[in-house]
Amino acid sequence: MTSPESLSSRHIRQGRTYTTTDKVISRSSSYSSNSSMSKDYGDHTPLSVSSAASETLPSPQYMPIRTFNTMPTAGPTPLHLFQNDRGIFNHHSSSGSSKTASTNKRGIAAAVALATAATIPFPLKKQNQDDNSKVSVTHNESSKENKITPSMRAEDNKPKNGCICGSSDSKDELFIQCNKCKTWQHKLCYAFKKSDPIKRDFVCKRCDSDTKVQVNQVKPMIFPRKMGDERLFQFSSIVTTSASNTNQHQQSVNNIEEQPKKRQLHYTAPTTENSNSIRKKLRQEKLVVSSHFLKPLLNEVSSSNDTEFKAITISEYKDKYVKMFIDNHYDDDWVVCSNWESSRSADIEVRKSSNERDFGVFAADSCVKGELIQEYLGKIDFQKNYQTDPNNDYRLMGTTKPKVLFHPHWPLYIDSRETGGLTRYIRRSCEPNVELVTVRPLDEKPRGDNDCRVKFVLRAIRDIRKGEEISVEWQWDLRNPIWEIINASKDLDSLPDPDKFWLMGSIKTILTNCDCACGYLGHNCPITKIKNFSEEFMRNTKESLSNKSYFNTIMHNCKP
């Protein structure tokens, strides 16, 4: 049988103390209604023993000692429990053994310690306290650093100057944002006045090469251009300064012609002339260039005419689907099989055109009908993407912008506004002398994975004289009413008013970007007809309005 001491110590370890009696009281049992002891009705109500019950007990040593509250969770012990327990314990210690009393005292102390430890945690070590203090300090410092002040918000909202002029000064300047690349440009650099309203569809010069800029405000900028595996070139000393050095220049060209043709050529070092001086020379002097000077001349002309341009030797694809389309149709009926190579192309000249506003491509030597002249390089994409882009104004113009050509048979177009070759400066004419054809070289192998199996080459449709400007036809949309003027099926006066007014607005928009290469000299030029009709119509409209106003004034004065 288990001794009373072992039972008492076991109950003390469990958090509650009981003394042994004839019937051992368990933690879960409660006193019955016939018992002489009262129930525990509250969390802090101690069990009491009545006087009647104390008389029936055989001996005080079998009376239960005051127990702790049987709470579901551990907690601090009330102070009056310690006092009552101390008094009861002293009362029974006189009649009981000293050994049992000391054991019960140790049990009470252990129970108090367990109850206190359940609610009051032990103190942390010194190292842990230091770590926690460091974490709190770091958190406070980071919160101060991450705090956004009004001045910082103003700095974030400040427009980022990405103007083509290259100036980083944004103080007291008016900006306009590009709708494509989201950069801020100076309004003065694009010939906008301070009072002019802001255009929502504004596109900067980098995104659209046709955007007009105010040259006086633009600082010269030099952009690196990728030339494939070849070295970087910059054209220099190619402009003929006077008639005295013309023979020397021709002699140098002849010397280069006698040398074996190689992929990598050596040119003179870049000069220190800025774009303004080069642009002035290009206006006044003639550029005589052979095929060996195509790339350096292209870089020089591009730096004086565009803000950013990449000269390429192989056409690029917009995506992989364009290349798949060409690979699946490279053997169509209109694809010309020839042993033509781009290195043996005809020589061309690039100089100012007759209107003194645009560059033009001229034949350096005479060409016969059917001769392949030069490859038209650029970025190849589907025509639908060009037509649906609102920045191209295709619905208003009814044709492509300069430096863009539609393929005559495939639903593709070649865009040389950002990448291309010298042929990008070719102009359109109502009397063209070249056409765009698709050539499949027989001997030339692809120069890379991105190299096309076919080439888009300009072919002469008639004999071309030396020095004659090379031009392609206007690629009018099939629904454009200008076809009725071209085919002479209708006159401008007989056209419906919607078509008439649309043609007037379309030709006005086209003439702001480029001119017809015929120079308005031909009587059959549809652009010349529409331009003259538009000017006459506006003049008559102003006269009629002025006459109507004058008539109204007379009638007003004649009233009684």
Swiss-Prot record:
Q: What residue spans carry the Polar residues bias annotation?
A: 47-59
Here the segments flagged for biased composition (Basic and acidic residues) are 141-157
Question: GO CC annotation: what is one?
Answer: Rpd3L-Expanded complex
Which Pfam family, an example, fits this chain?
SET
Instruction: List the keywords (alphabetical).
Output: Chromatin regulator, Metal-binding, Zinc, Zinc-finger
Q: Name the PROSITE patterns for this protein.
A: SET (PS50280), ZF_PHD_1 (PS01359), ZF_PHD_2 (PS50016)
Low complexity bias spans: 26-38
Per the record, the GO terms for biological process are: chromatin remodeling; regulation of cellular response to oxidative stress; regulation of DNA-templated transcription
SET domain segment(s): 346-475
Which InterPro entries does the protein's record reference?
A: Set3/4_SET, SET_dom, SET_dom_sf, Zinc_finger_PHD-type_CS, Znf_FYVE_PHD, Znf_PHD, Znf_PHD-finger, Znf_RING/FYVE/PHD
Q: Name one GO molecular function term.
A: methylated histone binding
Where are the stretches annotated Disordered? 1-61, 125-157
Please name the Gene3D superfamilies in this protein's record.
SET domain (2.170.270.10), Zinc/RING finger domain, C3HC4 (zinc finger) (3.30.40.10)
Start-end of PHD-type zinc fingers: 160-210
Q: Describe the function of this protein.
A: Putative chromatin regulator.
The record's comment on protein family reads:
Belongs to the SET3 family.
The protein's name in its UniProt record: SET domain-containing protein 4
